[in-house]
């Protein structure tokens, strides 16, 4: 089974889900953040918890640091955090607080020199989040066009000691309509970096198909809140 990384998206320390990254589609989840983490942590196939500070992503600076730090005591699973991470100090703060991995997006996409320095200071601790409509990369909470092609950009960071590349097809996100198998599979073939699929994953069949495409792990958002998604998993 492909590694599962259940996603928890935070707004004001509350678990929510968005559709296509649009903040006006915010839907509050029934379970609390803590209860969700405890539920996910009982499964061996869950290899880490993926947490995103949505307001931080929008504001271009971390907003939920203290709350996210408090979640470290809820689980023994590794935790990765993204949203508004744009400085060495922020990365250090998270790592020193017990967070295992940090996700960088906009800053790393806009400033490859900075990304290079950070990956060498924190080797294999950073994941690059590349969010795109198809091959067109978006930045700043998915609101702006980076004017970069997915494959052209990944070629430039291929040599860096990143933990991997998280690819989200925004058009699929939060819709439970299936991931973009074509582009995700092409990306997994294109780069030697581990590729993590995100956006649109519905059920276990999607996971098996992603695994067949040599995708390293799957970030599961909305589907992870459905009991039937977990049936038969251990």
Swiss-Prot record:
Pathway: Amino-acid biosynthesis; L-histidine biosynthesis; L-histidine from 5-phospho-alpha-D-ribose 1-diphosphate: step 4/9. It comes from Staphylococcus epidermidis (strain ATCC 12228 / FDA PCI 1200). GO terms for biological process: L-histidine biosynthetic process; L-tryptophan biosynthetic process. Keywords: Amino-acid biosynthesis, Cytoplasm, Histidine biosynthesis, Isomerase. Pfam families: His_biosynth (PF00977). The active site is at residues 9, 131. The keyword RNA-binding does not apply. This is 1-(5-phosphoribosyl)-5-[(5-phosphoribosylamino)methylideneamino] imidazole-4-carboxamide isomerase. The lineage of its organism: Bacteria, Bacillati, Bacillota, Bacilli, Bacillales. Signal peptide: none annotated. CDD domains: HisA. Gene3D superfamilies: Aldolase class I (3.20.20.70).
């Amino acid at each position: 089974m492909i590694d599962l990384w259940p996603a928890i998206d935070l707004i004001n320390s509350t678990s929510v889900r968005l559709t296509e990254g649009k903040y006006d589609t915010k839907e509050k989840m029934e379970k609390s953040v803590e209860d969700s983490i405890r539920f996910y942590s009982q499964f061996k196939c869950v290899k880490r918890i993926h947490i995103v500070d949505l307001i931080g992503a929008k504001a271009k600076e971390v907003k939920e640091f203290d709350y996210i730090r408090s979640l470290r005591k809820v689980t023994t699973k590794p935790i990765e955090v993204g949203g508004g991470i744009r400085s060495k100090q922020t990365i250090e703060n998270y790592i020193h607080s017990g967070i295992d991995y940090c996700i960088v997006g906009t800053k790393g996409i806009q400033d490859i020199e900075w990304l290079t320095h950070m990956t060498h200071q924190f080797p294999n601790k950073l994941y690059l989040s590349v969010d795109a409509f198809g091959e067109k990369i978006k930045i700043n909470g998915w609101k702006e066009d980076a004017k970069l092609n997915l494959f052209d950009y990944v070629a430039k960071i291929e040599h860096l000691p990143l933990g991997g590349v998280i690819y989200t097809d925004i058009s699929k996100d939060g819709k439970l309509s299936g991931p973009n198998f074509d582009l995700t599979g092409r990306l997994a073939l294109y780069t030697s970096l581990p590729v993590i699929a995100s956006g649109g994953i519905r059920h276990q069949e999607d996971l098996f198909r992603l695994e067949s495409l040599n995708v390293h792990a799957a970030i599961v958002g909305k589907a992870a809140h459905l009991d039937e998604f977990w049936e038969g998993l251990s």
